[in-house]
């Protein structure tokens, strides 16, 4: 995955047309070390326009290493799904998904260029990645926490506040702007009920556990209380 990220953002055309977003961006760029497994590279189309040239360039960049992907296109997104084998023993099948948001061509706080480096036995590379501020990445995570039932979103927000020291006031302000763009205004009480209901669902709790290394200690109840107290209580301010 790290090689694919370097390959994409080393390409002059792609780095001007795409911005890195999502959980993988948080763990690769803002957290001290990646804390959970991820097989998704989430990117945003920066400039409105045809997606074809971008897809062609991504495949010319990645296919020589990863092979031919399956392509899926929906309203607002395009996904390239690759299946490969791990480079080191034991060899295991891996999946890498590159998902492009073709709907949101903006950054509330402006796009950021962050250095990224990979050093391994199999690949060395450096690039500057076009991405979002920490708080904007977490604001879109907050939106995901409301809109879907995946405990990894709560985990990422917890890390963002505790380790990366993100500003919860900025997160909420940016979250509100994203929701306003969608035409989907949500109040704090409704969000608290939404998250409280999810905390009772086994699938929400178990979602992140399979993604964590054995040495990572995570308390979802503590995370729930933290996000509620630091973020959700500010939505109505």
Outline where the language-model segments fall.
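Structured mid-to-C-terminal alpha-helical surface segments
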Residues: 1-18, 29-41, 45-237
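Glycine-rich beta-strand-to-loop/alpha-helix junction loops that act as flexible
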Residues: 20-25
